[in-house]
Amino acid sequence: DWESLIKLIKEINENIKEYKSIDFECLVVNDASTIAQPELIKPNNIKSLQILNMKQNRGHARCNAFGIRYIFKNKNFDYLILMDGDGEDRPVEIKSLVNEVTKNTNISIVAKRVKRSEGPFFQLLYQTHKIITYIFTGKKINFGNYSCLIKKDVEKLHSAASLWSSYSGTVKLFLKDLSEINSIRGLRYFGPSQMSLFKLLIHSFSIIAVFKYQVFLRSTFIIIFLAYFSEYLGNTSIFFQIFIVLFNLIL
């Protein structure tokens, strides 16, 4: 979405203008867009603007992984801010990320979602997703891509195989110390949200799959619990036991 990208870059430029002593470089990962790339003009507060073109659209997770790996191997940097390019990660919150990481330069920052812009039905599904993720992994994952990573943590993440399927899951698995800022999920600059029910399910599975060992252990305890109370739960117990077994086989 080049139209969104152009607006995003302008807003980033506006929100970083007060940080005169910090050099900001912008790397855009193009997920094989079929729309002709327009001429992009580098704003005055951004030191450099570079486009990395993917050969195929393999999804945002692979784009993230590709960009993170490229930056670690090819760029000289202290911090990496990762964000979506459609406006849902609000550029105004870059200030909060920078200010927070300035207070403690040795801990990566994630943008915790405290409010979303979707309708009530989708928000209900999203809360269900977070509960299921917590039950099976024991991890409270309340953030997406929007984050500020210290270089040491980028080094930990860039070679992780799970990064190619889930950024937030990989961050939670490999980084034990994380700080956070409160973040409001913004509206897309152009068009409706691209997060459908199917994509939300894929998103959930991708996160849970990162924690296969924890999922197996927790599933075992849940099955034992259901079997013990099967006399009271009846066919419901059998249904959930079968579901959990199939769930683990899929992972």
Where are these regions (language model features)?
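Short, well-formed alpha-helical segments that are part of the catalytic scaffolds
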Residues: 1-17
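A conserved acidic beta->alpha catalytic loop
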Residues: 1, 30-39, 87-88
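Residue-level recognition of the N-termini of beta-strands and the immediately preceding loop/turn
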Residues: 22-26, 49, 78-83
